[in-house]
Amino acid sequence: ETIEPLFFDADSDGDLDLYTANGGIEFSKFIPYLSDKLYFNDGNGNFTESKLELPTNSIFFNSSTVEASDIDKDGDMDLFIGERLISDSYGVPGSGVILLNNGKGSFKDVTSLNAPELKNIGMITDAIFVDIDNDNDEDLIVIGEFMGINIFFNEKGLFKLSKSELSNYKGWWQSIQSGDFNGDGLLDLVVGNHGLNSRFSASKEFPIRLYVNDFDINDQLDPVLTFKRENGKFYPYDLRHNLIDQMKPLKKVFPDYRSFRSASIEDMFSSDQLDNSLKIDVNILSSSIFINKGNGKFDFHELPQKAQFSPVYSLFLKDFDLDGDLD
């Protein structure tokens, strides 16, 4: 399915063309339905699919977001594409790619040279180009599930991952926008998260943790979502029958619900299995605002309670009440 569309002038002819970032979990990563598409506008609102190969299609990319910026300052719009997940491998980090435009709608993948730290950055849900350090070029901010808020500073077209404190806010982030919310001339961030109205809770002291491994040795990865208790151990969110549906050998370990009811992740799998598992955490679920104080510093504020009732998948900023402030 089309996850995100973007209208931008791909071929520098003065009209808006259309890029569609496509993805989904229904198909193998080798199915062409996952391929992104670029449609050229003839100037009269008629769109024709580009015959040029898009770099993301040759690497079986499961796209989640597309953003445009003139990265190399040559007058045309270049692209960032984020990878939502790797098919059949939930939890395994995806990558972002930087595509430079030749001015005619032909794109080249320059990620390995211009932004190598985008490789395996995480399960990307959204991104934004914004001049967050106020140095007159657009930086790249990337968010996702089990990810921090990752700022890539633009240094003459090369993107360097910052050591910003925002990278420590590990969430199920879904959307991001920027605006000057306090009128100090610096761009701040508002970021949509899972919210606080569900059975899930997370903090730095008691994070949610996802373990990913082929626990039942059947050549398929098994993601197991857990929460931390006061005793320091992690316990599965899923019930016994759900886990057995995923991993049949657990039926012998836990023959009934009584034997399973107090089982921690350490009771389910060996220490070697857990040590060799991919482990990623979430420590914040609130949709939040980060006020830019300059020099890479931000003040954190939760959005009001009504903004926490559900996951925030999209954000739109506008001065609705005409008071000079962004709502």
Name each model-derived stretch.
Residues I121-D184, D188-V190:
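A compositional/structural signature marking long, glycine- and acidic/polar-rich segments
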Residues S28-L34, D88-G94, G144-M147, S201-F206, ...:
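Short, solvent-exposed loop/turn segments at conserved positions within beta-propeller repeat blades
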Residues F146, W173, L186, E205-P207, ...:
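Active-site lining segments that contact anionic ligands and/or coordinate catalytic metals
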Residues E1, K37-F61, P93, V97-G122, ...:
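Blade-edge motifs of beta-propeller repeat domains
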Residues E1-S12, L16, F40, N62-K73, ...:
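Beta-propeller blade termini
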Residues L18-N22, L79-E83, D139-G144, L189-N193, ...:
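Hydrophobic beta-strand segments that make up the repeating blades of beta-propeller
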Residues H301-P311, K318, L322, D327:
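Secondary-structure-rich domain cores
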Residues F27, S87-S89, G148-N150, L196-R199, ...:
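Flexible loop/turn segments at secondary-structure boundaries
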